[in-house]
């Protein structure tokens, strides 16, 4: 009989490609990488100057002089329908172990387990902020202990400058958080938040900052809206819609 016999275990054609499960895994990984690149490429580009006007993005602000060679600068801004003196008390009482950070509580408590309570009123007992004080981002008992940026300059109703330089040599400022209040008409305030990073930031921290940058920006934007909501509620009655 002519021809070639074939039977169980004998392949008569070329091997097939990856199975459905492997193809799905590859597709998922490709989508995850694309989402990560998009998040780190697009989101920071959109949010790093969220709300800021052209002049506000480049205008010198109190605290800029601490890092004259900054290699990464973000400037966000929001208009608040309240006077600077009505916005200021919400700034000086910030801290996870005080009035909170006015951002997304679900992230602060559900994900990060910070135990934050974001205040909806001004606390007189937390208004005496001074140079050298820490605005806590993590509470005592948290891994690493109570940590956060340190106040290096403040002028009531005008600006609050924080040194955010973990891991830097003593006396070296490699990161700042700068809140600035500008008059915006008879009953308004422009609230600016500028974040500056210097070239001397430790390599490990630079990598962490890059990975977490989208989250930082989203939380910072929510914080500004949270301050706006609270200040407007105290000045003009019902607050606007914002995170709490």
What does each of the following model-derived ranges do?
Residues 47-73, 80-81:
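N-terminal signal-anchor transmembrane helix
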Residues 197-220:
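A short acidic/glycine-rich loop-to-helix N-cap element
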Residues 83-86, 215, 219, 223:
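Short amphipathic alpha-helical segments
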Residues 243-244:
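Acidic, Ser/Thr-rich low-complexity intrinsically disordered segments
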Residues 18-45:
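Hydrophobic alpha-helical topogenic segments used for membrane insertion/localization
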Residues 2-3, 67, 79, 84-85, ...:
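Glycine-rich portal/gate segments that line the openings of hydrophobic small-molecule binding cavities
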Residues 30, 89-96, 209, 213-216:
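Short hydrophobic helices that act as membrane-entry/anchoring signals
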Residues 4-20, 239-240:
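Intrinsically disordered, low-complexity terminal tails and inter-domain linkers enriched
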């Amino acid at each position: 009989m002519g021809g070639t016999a074939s039977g169980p275990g004998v392949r008569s054609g070329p091997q097939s490609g990856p199975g459905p499960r492997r193809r799905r895994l590859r597709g998922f990984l490709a989508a995850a990488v694309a989402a990560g690149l998009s998040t780190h490429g697009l989101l920071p580009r959109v949010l790093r100057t969220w709300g800021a006007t052209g002049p506000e993005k480049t205008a010198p602000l109190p605290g800029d002089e601490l890092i004259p060679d900054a290699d990464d600068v973000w400037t966000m801004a929001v208009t608040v329908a309240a006077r600077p003196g009505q916005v200021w008390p919400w700034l000086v009482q910030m801290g996870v172990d005080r009035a909170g950070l006015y951002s997304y509580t679900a992230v602060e408590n559900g994900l990060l387990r910070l135990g934050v309570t974001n205040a909806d009123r001004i606390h007189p007992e937390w208004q005496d902020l001074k140079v050298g004080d820490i605005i806590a981002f993590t509470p005592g008992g948290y891994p690493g202990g109570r940590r956060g940026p340190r106040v290096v300059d403040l002028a009531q109703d005008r600006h609050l400058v924080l040194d955010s330089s973990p891991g830097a040599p003593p006396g070296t400022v490699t990161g700042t958080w700068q809140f600035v209040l500008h008059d915006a008409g008879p009953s308004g305030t422009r609230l600016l938040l500028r974040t500056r990073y210097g070239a001397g930031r430790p390599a490990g921290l630079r990598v962490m900052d890059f990975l977490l940058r989208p989250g930082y920006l989203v939380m910072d934007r929510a914080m500004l809206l949270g301050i706006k909501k609270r200040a407007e509620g105290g000045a003009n009655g019902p607050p606007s819609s914002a995170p709490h």
